[in-house]
Amino acid sequence: MDSTISNTSKLDKPVSLIWGCELNEQTKTFTFKVSDEDKSEHQLALRTVCLGNAAKDEFHIVEIVPQAVEGSDAKPVPIATLKPSILPMATMVGIELTPPVTFQLKSGSGPIYISGQHVALEADYSWAEEEEGEEEVEEEEEEEDPESPPKPVKRPAASKKAGQAKKKKMEKDEEESSEEEDSPAKKGKGRGRKPSKK
């Protein structure tokens, strides 16, 4: 996997390559693997499995052969069954595998083309060093800055409506008191009283 991408850009985003293989009568299996020396994390996301134009009108079954793990009784898993007259191509969604991965043509003569996306993520341990450096800088800044006094709590301003209502009430009270002072006391029967029965 030779690349002209700089080391810093690899850390920013993963390297993504188009990948593909062919299974046929001569090559019934294919193993996708990466070198042991490569420290990057690799994933293979399958996209399509399709028949070639020379494929016979028969069923072609493609399966993934799980790795032999001690004490495991894993069997091959079929991922596509294709036939030129019925289904010449299958789109794969959500099949992301970690290498090594072995594909096998269980039945049929092919050719079958498997394609996908090979993503390589370089292990990035520089973040730990950067965080340590940032913490030291923050500690130095805290030591240099004296503690700032607490900020006073602001009271919310009274709303305009409340102020206007209060102003109107005060004006009304003033008018009533001025009317009482200006007008002489009324004489006669009391207002609002019921007349007494004779």
From Swiss-Prot:
InterPro entries, A to Z: Nucleoplasmin (IPR004301), Nucleoplasmin_core_dom (IPR024057), Nucleoplasmin_core_dom_sf (IPR036824)
GO cellular component term of the entry, any: nucleoplasm
Biased composition regions of type Basic residues, renumbered to the chain: 152-169, 186-198
Keyword Chaperone: yes
Region (Acidic tract A1): 35-38
Family: Belongs to the nucleoplasmin family.
UniProt-recorded name of the protein: Nucleoplasmin
Organism: Aquarana catesbeiana (American bullfrog)
Gene that encodes it: np
